[in-house]
Each structure stands twice: as structure tokens, then as C-alpha cells.
Amino acid sequence: LVVLAYQVWYLSPSIPITSFLKSEQASHLLSGKPVVTLSGTRNMWIKAQEKIAEMLKKHNAPIVANVALTDRHHNHISVLTIVHWLFTGKKDRYLGIFPKAGVSEKDMASASLYGEMVLKQMQIGIYTPDLQKEIVAQGGVQIRPFLLSAEKKANRLFGIWARLIYGSPRRKFLLKCFHAYLYLAIWILMPIVWLFYWITYPL
């Protein structure tokens, strides 16, 4: 059994884990082995997980369980707290009123429960679909319909930006444009889309 923990960068698997999974070493280590994937993100991880699954499939390494720990607070609150954490290095209550950033200590402490679930099936030597169902039931994976919808759209847009910026002689200018786009998307477009989604869902 392999426990594969990875980071998500801009809705995709990080460059280090992607580079590893595309290496000959990964093929040697993972071939034919069951894999448990583990990620800790702000709130969007599904598209990255799909890409991880595709790369593991090429190594004949089936995913038998996935644990995706996230910041459970409101999207825009988590933006503020994560930025505070990143730029100060302090994982405290921003301004004394906001919650702590990232995955909660409670969720991290409870992660051992998922390990016990995996261990039971590992000792038997058979991994069944019930394992993932148990993890979901215990909160090891949460899917929010609105965030999933937003993530799919953002993933496509990030791909467009990446193709525009990579190798461009106007790289610095385009990066500034991307920076401005992120602010626009997070603080203006997302609330509008969320309101429209809230009004129409589940119509």
C-alpha cells in the first residue's frame, strides 16, 4: 500500500508531485500497488484529484481510498485567512475575529480515524468500495456543488492563462494581468455566480 500525499496549486497537482508521477522512479515504486491519496486544500481539490487518478492509472496503481481535508469555512472568509497566513506565517485568528486558516486542528486530529479504516482492509488484503463510503460518512471527503461548478470553470480558465503566459516574451505583463484577474474573479465574479447559483439551484 502507498499513501500518496500531495499539494494542489491553482486547482492542479503541484509541480513536484506531477514531476514525480511522470518519472520512471514513480513507475517502479507504484506499479501494481494500491494507493490512498491524501490532500489538504482551501476548498477546491476535485479536478486535481482527477488528474492524479489519471497519472496513477498509467502506472497501474488503483486508488482504493481518498481523503481530502479542507478549510470548512465560507469561501471568502477562507481567502482572507489563508492570505494572512501566507504573508505573515502566523496561523492565528486574523484581526482577532476570523477563524484560523486552513484545515482545522480537529480535522487533522481525526485523520487517524481514516488510517484505521484503511488498516482494517489492508490487513485483510482486500480493498472494497465500502472503504471510501466509510471515509465520506466520517467527513473525510466533502463535495460542495457550487464549489465544484466554480472549480470546473476556473480550471479551464487557468489552463488558458497558463498557455498564454508560458514562454511568452510578455510574461511579466501577463502575470500582472493574471493577478488582477484573480482579484476580479474572487471578489466580484464569484459572489455574482454564487448568488445566481443559489437562486436557481436545484432548478
Locations of regions flagged by a protein language model:
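FMN-binding flavodoxin-like domain, especially the glycine-rich phosphate-binding loop
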Residues: 2-203
